[in-house]
Every structure is written in C-alpha cells, then in structure tokens.
Curated annotation (Swiss-Prot):
Family listed: Belongs to the BI1 family. LFG subfamily.
Compartment(s) where it occurs, according to its Swiss-Prot or TrEMBL record: Cell membrane; Membrane raft; Postsynaptic cell membrane
Superkingdom, natural source: Eukaryota
Subunit details: Interacts with FAS/TNFRSF6 and BAX.
Keyword entries, A-Z: Apoptosis, Cell membrane, Glycoprotein, Membrane, Postsynaptic cell membrane, Synapse, Transmembrane, Transmembrane helix
Glycosylation sites (chain numbering): N191
Keyword Cell membrane in record: yes
Job description of the protein: Antiapoptotic protein which protects cells uniquely from Fas-induced apoptosis. Regulates Fas-mediated apoptosis in neurons by interfering with caspase-8 activation. Plays a role in cerebellar development by affecting cerebellar size, internal granular layer (IGL) thickness, and Purkinje cell (PC) development.
Protein name from the UniProt record: Protein lifeguard 2
Amino acid sequence: MTQGKLSVANKAPGTEGQQQVHGEKKEAPAVPSAPPSYEEATSGEGMKAGAFPPAPTAVPLHPSWAYVDPSSSSSYDNGFPTGDHELFTTFSWDDQKVRRVFVRKVYTILLIQLLVTLAVVALFTFCDPVKDYVQANPGWYWASYAVFFATYLTLACCSGPRRHFPWNLILLTVFTLSMAYLTGMLSSYYNTTSVLLCLGITALVCLSVTVFSFQTKFDFTSCQGVLFVLPMTLFFSGLILAILLPFQYVPWLHAVYAALGAGVFTLFLALDTQLLMGNRRHSLSPEEYIFGALNIYLDIIYIFTFFLQLFGTNRE
C-alpha cells in the first residue's frame, strides 16, 4: 500500500506536480501559490518569489522635459552662441520680460545714434562753410576712419570693455561720432535732394525689414553660409573696382556694386534684428545690448551710403 501513497516528503527537485501511483507517474493538477499573509506583506519577511509582479523600470528623463535654470548655465560666450542652443531653454514670463527690456534698451541706444548721425549729416549738407571746410581738409576723414576702426574692433572683439559700464558707453559714443563724421563728409559731396531722397528710402527699407523680421517665421540666423559668401563677394567686387578706378570709371559697374552692397546689408539688418528676439536658432545675450545696437547701426549706415552711390547725384 505504500506504493499507492503520494511521495510528498521525499520527492526529488523538479518532480513537483507529479504523482507515482502503482509505479506509474501521473501529472497532478497545478495548485496556485497561496497569497502572502498580512504580516508577511507588511514586514517583507518570508515573501515568496513571484508573489508580486516586478516593479517597472524607471523611464529615463529626456533633457527637454526638465526645466533648466537659465541663471545656472548660459550657452553664450562673448555674445555669441557656442552651439545650437538658445540662451533660454524655457520661455517663462520672466524670460520674455527680460528679452523685452533688452530689445527696448537696444532700440533706445540705436535711436540716439541715428539722431546724432542725422544731425551731423544735416550740418554737413546744409551749412556751406562746414561743407567747404571738411572737403578742404581730408585729413580729418582719415583720422575719423582710424578712430572708427579702432573702436569697432574693441567693441566687437573684446567682451570686457563692451559689457562694463561706463567704458561701453564711452567707446560707443566715440564710435558713433567718428561714424557720423564719415557719413556726413560723404553726404557733403551729393546735392541736398539726393541726400534727403536716400534718407527717406533708407528709413522705409529699414522699417519694412524690421517689421518683416519680427513677423516672419523664416530664420535668418540659420543662414550663416549664405551670409558669409555674400560679404566675400562684395569685398572682392570692391577690390576689383578699386583697381579699375585709376584707369577708367565704369558707371554701371559701380551701380551693380552699390545695389549688391545695399542688398547684402539689408539681409544683415534682418539677421541682426532676429538676433535680438531670442526665439530663433541663435540669439544675443541680454548683456550684449551694446553689441546689438552697434550691429544694427552699422547696417543702417551702410545701407544709406550704398543708396547714395546708387541714387545720389554729385554736386556741380
């Protein structure tokens, strides 16, 4: 009769669920494991393996899901982005407020620069004694050009003087006065009607480009390749014209050069305007208000001078 008994106590590993009856093995029905008791579940002792499903693995956090504090890490160095990241990784109300204050500060400085330049151009255009003096003394032109070039390199290449008050405003004032003198002397060689006409055209073009840059979805800051090739083309074209000028003056070549220059700096105006906005691929740091005003001011001045070459009429 012992053969007919179930061998439970002495069964070998791996023979669970089997019975040995009259020398024959039969499958026993599977019995579900009993759930743990309340004490086992709460104390964690004696918990059977497989009693509960394993906990799901943690989902790795994507960097774009986490808030990054803009004050803790900035992706800018000397006013230019070091990569393809924006200055602000999140655009909260405070970030937008900082950007609006930055844009307001840039355009306030730009307005003062343009008013000073307009006053100098009007003085050199309408006052005959001043106009005759600056044309008779070209040395002041070259001195102003040297000051302009030195201050421009300092403001463009050195982040220290550009960001520290009051040196940034002093350098920008000297730069603006020297550039205003250069623009005024150039305007003195054209008649008053041409100067006024080019001023009006420049104002309309710059206003239209500024409004377009703020409204369009096209990102000019992602076109660095094109905006590098065009100035190189303009530079070599000007070099060829400078070589040909002592031998022969070709009016249509100068007209093409002036049109190309006006177009290139119009594109640069759109680029520099979008750099202020902060919602493009690249944007300026809010600390770079001097650099932003400097770039837009130069764009407007160069557009005006190229329009003078294109539409202006020399004085008789």
